[in-house]
Amino acid sequence: MLNPIVRKFQYGQHTITLETGVIARQANAAVMASMDETAVFVTVVGQKKIHTGQKFFPLTVNYQERTYAAGRIPGGFFRREGRPSENEILTARLIDRPLRPLFPKKFLNEIQIIATVVSVNPQINPDIISIIGASAALSLSGIPFYGPVGAARVGYINNQYILNPISDDMKNSSLDLVVSGTQNAILMVEAESKILSEEKILGAIIFGHQQQQVVINNIRSLSNEASKLPWVISYPETNKTLELKIINSFEKNISDAYVIFNKQDRIEKLNSIKENIIKLFLDENSNIDTLEIEDIFQKIEKKVVRKRILSNQTRIDGREKDMIRALDVRTGILPRTHGSALFTRGETQSLVSVTLGTSRDAQNLDELLGDRIDNFLFHYNFPPYSVGEIGMVGSPKRREIGHGRLAKRSLLAVMPTLENFPYTIRVVSEITESNGSSSMASVCGASLALMDAGVPIKSAVAGISMGLVKEGNQHVLLSDILGDEDHLGDMDFKVAGTEEGITALQMDMKIEGITNEIIHSALNEARLARLHILNVMNQALNESRSEISEFAPRIHIIKINPEKIKDVIGKGGSVIRMLTEETGTIIEIEDDGTVKISSTVKEKAKNAIRRIKEITAEIEVGRIYSGKVTRIVDFGAFVSIGLGKEGLVHISQISDKRVDKVSNHLKIDQIISVKVLEIDRQGRLRLSIKEIDSSILSNKSINNSII
């Protein structure tokens, strides 16, 4: 019999329901988690056997949105969901980040979490309930897990923090912050803001963490009633004799290697030491486990680096704890791009380009919460050569998508509106060197490249990555961390913003016990570092260029009467197609009569504008127009006096004298001047040649007429 076990509770303005025991009973745990009408079904499956040679914790999180959740059928030929969208990948990462640090350090069993959106209210984003559902499922599974965690979205509207605001409210919010943590510790923060102060961001983090305690308590209550027996895990004992031998013989060598400032030289030296250790002990005992030697080696590396930092010695590359690496800033280095910059910070380097396009280049996004158009694209590429390695080159991986999204969010607060700058903007960051915080280098490079492209951003944006080493009550904050400091430290805290405040933030903790005071200090240290970087950037380029690149399309905007749109488009698009081909421009028309003409050549755009104005001009009775004969019939001739406007010159209106045959007086494609006699109720034009003054009808006048 199916035996549902349910917890239902109020969470801010929403009702949360967690149900287990009915669906997917062969998984280690399964939870149907819902926030009002948005429901996510989360399963957890773990392997009790560790794969041979496993060196890292193989946790996989899959987040998938089913279109039936919104009552829709997928598009495309196959009419079914395909590869994960960018939003699905980003949400999977959001679920993963607060959960990963809560597994035991030596736990190497494969775990898969699958979160499937099965019902969605467009006003309630599924990401928060997905984290809650995953936390609940892990807590029920019996898998070793130091949870549960809660999650909350915090908005900031009218100087007040709002818990889990609905989508409509988020449009008026100056903050979109997601925070997740355990009862006592904050583990993950992801935020985008409209230039808020450090104090307001910290207040939002604390508010969100306090509010989510009700979630944690209810998951614990559910776990007490429905959790499975905990796994019995035996971790292999470390060979203490081997560890002591390696420490006594090689710790000093490893310590000396970590005073080599150059990353590649340091890696080469460390690899050489490791190879010597493995060779030495294999010669003594051919059956020795080399993986164990590597584990001991990594443990010594971590101990050496952390001990040096905590004892206030210089860091790996010789810097003090709050020192920023040497900066080199260059703009306009790619001659044919619309904007470019090269931002170098120590051994981390980003080559950024900006391309301007029309609204046709915008990305149409078919998302579960509704369709939307994105006019600002940010793509981050991390090729293997950036870290001196050989690797696969292809479609972007999850990490690249996540870093690109963070960099994009860092810039959104300063981007111009479409009304002020009607371009689609694509930014591409090529990471050409990497040794820590390449995403924040991308933010700095993108800010410079946008200004180089003439994009009128409100102010420059810079980013910095902060680190932390904590042992007991002692802790040291590090500014502008290296890759090794990220790997061997306890926190990765990325902060981006302007001189006035923060635009984006991403924080990932690897340990519990990070206090609010430490977060506050990290925010303040990040502000000082950000101001230093902005000062260097402003020396290279302190405002957007007044003109866009000569190679970028110029967009000219005119307004026409909406009733005239059909005249510009023509039957089956014939007129606008002809205009586009003949003028060499791109013409876009909106329903309100806004016409955008884009071209890299100013004269071509002017020509297109002139011809559109001719088409949309109001025909006045009694006015004389230049026209072209388009058809000759027995009873007269049809004359075009502008694209889409054709009138009849009756045979009686050709001349004062009797006209026996129209073709004796007029020829096809002949340019003539005509006078508008009448516009009937159906908009048809009655034209005349004979009514025009004889001076205008001179051959010279006719031959010089242009339409």
UniProtKB/Swiss-Prot annotation:
Its main location: cytoplasm. Residues 622-690 form the S1 motif domain. Residues 553-612 form the KH domain. It catalyses: RNA(n+1) + phosphate = RNA(n) + a ribonucleoside 5'-diphosphate. It comes from the Bacteria. SUPFAM superfamilies: Eukaryotic type KH-domain (KH-domain type I), Nucleic acid-binding proteins, Polynucleotide phosphorylase/guanosine pentaphosphate synthase (PNPase/GPSI), domain 3, Ribonuclease PH domain 2-like, Ribosomal protein S5 domain 2-like. SMART domains: KH, S1. Mg(2+) binds at D486, D492. InterPro entries: ExoRNase_PH_dom1 (IPR001247), ExoRNase_PH_dom2 (IPR015847), ExoRNase_PH_dom2_sf (IPR036345), KH_dom (IPR004087), KH_dom_type_1 (IPR004088), KH_dom_type_1_sf (IPR036612), NA-bd_OB-fold (IPR012340), PNPase (IPR012162). One of its GO terms (cellular component) is cytosol. Its cofactor is Mg(2+). CDD domains: KH-I_PNPase (cd02393), RNase_PH_PNPase_1 (cd11363), RNase_PH_PNPase_2 (cd11364), S1_PNPase (cd04472). Gene3D superfamilies: GHMP Kinase, N-terminal domain, K Homology domain, type 1, Nucleic acid-binding proteins. Keywords: Cytoplasm, Magnesium, Metal-binding, Nucleotidyltransferase, RNA-binding, Transferase. NCBIfam families: polynuc_phos, PRK11824.1. Component of the RNA degradosome, which is a multiprotein complex involved in RNA processing and mRNA degradation. This is Polyribonucleotide nucleotidyltransferase. It comes from Buchnera aphidicola subsp. Acyrthosiphon pisum (strain APS) (Acyrthosiphon pisum symbiotic bacterium). The gene is pnp.
